[in-house]
């Protein structure tokens, strides 16, 4: 179902990162009512730039680390909902790429995403009288086929795809729809230098960047297109400047 971002309220976790900041710039061009950015480190210059792009959009920043206990996330969301009354879209975009940091990679890329999603369901779940909402989770093409030198990172992204696909199937119960956007290799600081698992490939970043990549701007443009297409359960691939819906193969069914 096509979705217009005009006059909508959007929460963007990690909306000041490489792909995140360029996506935030595209979002404010769509005449949002509010863009609420949750990120670990404040960037006043970036916030000012977003406000300058479209002064009609209210851009707000709150410090947020996705690895905090879920109770802290719920407290922050309560503050945001009290201010805005309604939130239309949650974008979960926090991510790190460093297979030296096993626990933190899992905590940021997967557990934090699950906890933030779980927390917002308290406000959105129609079983609790909520209005429903839209969740856009940022995965990666490595969630389809791993970069085998970074199996921890790739594994977290596969988990994001699976979790989000389950959320989408639960929409008739919760009223909350969900989909993933899965960027290919994008030229950001995330991929300029990173560590492989157990140092199996010390030059993994250099070798990866020797192959075709995309700019964060082209990725961001397709990111927002995916949000506007608003297809529950979609698994979007954003690679080399293109946007493509992935058809997932079913090899097993729980039967329930």
UniProtKB/Swiss-Prot annotation:
SUPFAM superfamilies: NAD(P)-binding Rossmann-fold domains (SSF51735)
GO biological-process terms attached to the record: acetaldehyde metabolic process; acetyl-CoA biosynthetic process from ethanol; alcohol catabolic process; behavioral response to ethanol; NADH metabolic process
EC number in record: 1.1.1.1
Highest taxon listed in the record's lineage: Eukaryota
Disulfide bonding pattern of the chain: none
Similarity comment text for this entry: Belongs to the short-chain dehydrogenases/reductases (SDR) family.
Subunit text: Homodimer.
Annotated protein name in UniProt: Alcohol dehydrogenase
Originating species: Drosophila erecta
Gene from which this protein is expressed: Adh
């Amino acid at each position: 179902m096509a979705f217009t971002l005009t006059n909508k309220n959007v929460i963007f976790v990690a909306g000041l990162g490489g792909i995140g900041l360029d996506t935030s710039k595209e979002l404010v061009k769509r005449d949002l009512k509010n863009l609420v950015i949750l990120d670990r480190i404040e960037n006043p210059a970036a916030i000012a730039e977003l406000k300058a792009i479209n002064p009609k959009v209210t851009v707000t920043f709150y410090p947020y680390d996705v690895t905090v206990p879920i109770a802290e996330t719920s407290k922050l969301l309560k503050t945001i909902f009290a201010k805005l009354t309604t939130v239309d879209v949650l974008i979960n975009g926090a991510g790190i790429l460093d297979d030296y940091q096993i626990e933190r990679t899992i905590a940021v890329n997967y557990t934090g995403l699950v906890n933030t999603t779980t927390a917002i369901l308290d406000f959105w779940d129609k079983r609790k009288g909520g209005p429903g909402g839209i969740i856009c989770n940022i995965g990666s093409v490595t969630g389809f086929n791993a970069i085998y030198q970074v199996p921890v990172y790739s594994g977290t992204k596969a988990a994001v795809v699976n979790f989000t696909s389950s959320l989408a199937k639960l929409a008739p119960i919760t009223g909350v729809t969900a989909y993933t956007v899965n960027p290919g290799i994008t030229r950001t600081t995330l991929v300029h230098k990173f560590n492989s698992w157990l140092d199996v490939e010390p030059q993994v970043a250099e070798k990866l960047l020797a192959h075709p990549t995309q700019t964060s701007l082209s990725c961001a443009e397709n990111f927002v297109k995916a949000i506007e297409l608003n297809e529950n359960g979609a698994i979007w691939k954003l690679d080399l400047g293109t946007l493509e819906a992935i058809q997932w193969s079913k090899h097993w069914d729980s039967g329930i």
